[in-house]
Amino acid sequence: MTSRLSDPNSSARSDMSVPLYPTASPVSVEAYYSESEDEAANDFLVRMGRQQSVLRRRRRRTRCVGMVIACLLVAVLSGGFGALLMWLLR
């Protein structure tokens, strides 16, 4: 269902349509729940909680690895600049 702008003198184009209802976003296969399945609502919520925990742990692990790499990079660059400075001042 769409509504059309009826005022031909408006600054907007007259053939522009505006949806009355937002389009449905695609449902993730992992988050799909149906009453016809053998899974109870409580089991579904437990499964979703576990999936969210896994995603949270993965993000935390990725952030930690990134921080370690950044610290190592800063240490190597600092050591390189220190060695260059000592070589130039020798």
Curated annotation (Swiss-Prot):
Coiled coil: none
Main localization category: virion
Location in the cell: Virion membrane; Host Golgi apparatus membrane; Host smooth endoplasmic reticulum membrane; Host cell membrane
Highest taxon, organism lineage: Viruses
UniProt keyword Transcription regulation present: no
Gene Ontology biological-process entries: intracellular transport of virus
Pfam families: Herpes_US9
Family: Belongs to the alphaherpesvirinae envelope protein US9 family.
Known function: Essential for the anterograde spread of the infection throughout the host nervous system. Together with the gE/gI heterodimer, US9 is involved in the sorting and transport of viral structural components toward axon tips.
Protein name per its UniProtKB record: Envelope protein US9
